[in-house]
Amino acid sequence: MAVGKNKGLSKGGKKGLKKKIVDPFTRKDWYDIKAPSMFTTRQVGKTLVNRTQGTKIASEGLKGRVVEVSLADLQSDADAERSFRKFRLIVEDVQNRSVLCNFHGMDLTTDKLRSMVKKWQTLIEAHVDVKTTDGYLLRIFCIGFTQKDQMSTRKTSYAQHSQVRNIRRKMVSIVTDEITKCDLKGVVTKLVPDAIAKDIEKACQGIYPLHDVYIRKVKVLKKPRFELSKLLELHGDGGSKTGEVGETGSKVDRPEGYEPPVQETV
């Protein structure tokens, strides 16, 4: 056994007792998340980031963050048809204490997808890569199910392989025609009411009746070069003002001379 002094005991205490505990949230700032002007609710939440310190800039830490918001929250609507559709928004620029987001994708919730898959029917899926007029390359996934004839006594509603191919071909052609004629803002405007899926359901009635037709997923594969002017145009006035149109709130009645209490900690 080696003989020597125990430095930890000679100092009269354990290591780390005199170290000050610093709350990490004191070094962070809150930023408002602003959605594009295509949605009713513009302020969808807040996000945290460390303050600018040395070479680490706060705005650089915010750019590229992706948030996922339900369409019901974006449209301030409790409609069940919108609650299962999720939109992804990506932070592209920072203006004062607001982060400006752009469309980054769409998806359906897992429980909605699982609830639609049932026995005695045919599931039909299709996907296609299309480019918008402003240079965004999108991959669109579509899903639909065959519908049982109410007048028929058959238990099943299976479609033939030729009918499935024709329906899939019709899905691809309608999605391509709708997306290639508009820019990204127009695509989001069509995705909010799910107008493309309704057109597909109507066009496929002559081949085989469908139900539960949805645009299942939208992925952004490629983007054009970032331009701040286009992002500000997408947000209307840029979202840098605190009292921006679309921020909802309620007025609180307070007595005259009311002053908020002084907080002990921040």
UniProtKB/Swiss-Prot annotation:
Name assigned to this protein: Small ribosomal subunit protein eS1
Record family assignment: Belongs to the eukaryotic ribosomal protein eS1 family.
One GO cellular component term: cytosolic small ribosomal subunit
Lineage: superkingdom: Eukaryota
Gene Ontology biological-process entries: translation
Region annotation Disordered: where it falls in the sequence: 237-266
Binding partners and assembly: Component of the small ribosomal subunit. Mature ribosomes consist of a small (40S) and a large (60S) subunit. The 40S subunit contains about 33 different proteins and 1 molecule of RNA (18S). The 60S subunit contains about 49 different proteins and 3 molecules of RNA (28S, 5.8S and 5S).
GO molecular function, one term: structural constituent of ribosome
Subcellular location: Cytoplasm
Keyword Ribonucleoprotein belongs to the record: yes
Major location (coarse): cytoplasm
Keyword Transmembrane: no
